Amino acid sequence: MRKKILTLTLALIMLIMPFMSTKSINQVNASEQIVDSTCKAYVLMDKDSGKVLNENNSDTRMPVASIVKLMTILLTLEKIDCGEISVTDKVTVSENASGMGGSQVFLDANCEYEVGNLLKSVIVCSANDSSVALAEYIAGNEQLFVKEMNEKAKELNMTNTNYENATGLPSTNQYSSALDVAKVLREVLDYDLYQEYSKVWLEDFVHPSGRTTEMTNTNKLSRFYEGCLGGKTGSTNEAKYCLGVGAKRNNLSLIAVALGCENSKERFSTCSEMLNYGFSHYENKVVFNQENLNDIKIKMQGQNEMLSLVCERESNIVTEIGKEIKVDLKFNLPNSLVSVKQNECVGSVDVIINGEKYDSINLLSSKDIKEPSYLDYLKRIQEDFIG
């Protein structure tokens, strides 16, 4: 079937900062120093696209302390999401898990705790004992869970990461990088349950015996930074002070990671500075959505009907505020169709920005249309003859 190609050219010209130079749409001045910090590595990333907006030593391997728990959290969230486990499942805590030390909620060995409460304590107060209890429940033992952690890291293209435990407690060959931390945090932030637990600032963790352990959120930005989606802290003598955090304002979602800071205050100030820079210099621009399909229809053979289309998703791009961009839409659609089912993919649209292909979105049928019968064809011939 022949394809017809429709090209629409849209000029999206933003006049807020007309003095800015025009660059290739994929070019970002990622090496520009945007924070005054002594941290060893940092990265600022657009959450939706994964584009790095700014970085320093972001691929350097280094210890990240409890930020390792982001992968423990991610694997637990995935198991909950796919139905393998539930937040109400009961976990019997082993002697090994209860004796982890470091940051903890002081779990009672041989007692049962719900998955949801254990996960919350990992997210809120970085509980080592809860991390190991979840690892043992999910995989049978911590080392098997660590194997899953490293497999997931490989899947996410975290090329500078190796896990040796589920907690981030010091281990000889355990490391990650600022960029890899941003990659795993990007995945974690997609879960509503994570964001829900991340908003907890102060809460009592209730044990089966009735005693309580007070949990205080280790991520101060969850309370004091507008639009904070969640994050993870980490600190050891080797890793110093680390933080990965996400925030959203005006439809723009950013991730900031700072590793190897000299003190706790610096990790929060460094990430805040990066986020502030991002929100003041970048915007999330819609370059294709349903409105672009208002005048795009497909003829149905043998019928007095035109098929309307639905976009599978919209397309956005993060670009510098005030930057001029040119958007071309190249529609790849059949000239006509005989029949179609609702939500069936019937074509696609390529989004081309400044002459470079940026995205491709499937276009779906808006409804069912059956193939016309013999009588329908006769009726159509009659109508055309009379008309």
Label the model's feature ranges:
Residues R2-Q27:
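Sec-dependent N-terminal signal peptides of Gram-positive bacterial secreted proteins and lipoproteins
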Residues K3-I5, L70, R249:
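Hydrophobic alpha-helical segments, especially transmembrane helices
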Residues K3-I5, N26-Q27, S31, N294, ...:
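Polar/charged alpha-helical tracts
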Residues L6-T9, S37-T38, T60-R61, L118, ...:
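Generic detector of short alpha-helix boundary/capping microenvironments
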Residues S21-L179, K183-D192:
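Active-site-adjacent loops and short helices of periplasmic peptidoglycan-processing enzymes
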Residues M158-T159, P170-Y175, L179-G387:
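Domain-terminus/edge residues, biased toward the C-terminal soluble/receptor-binding domains
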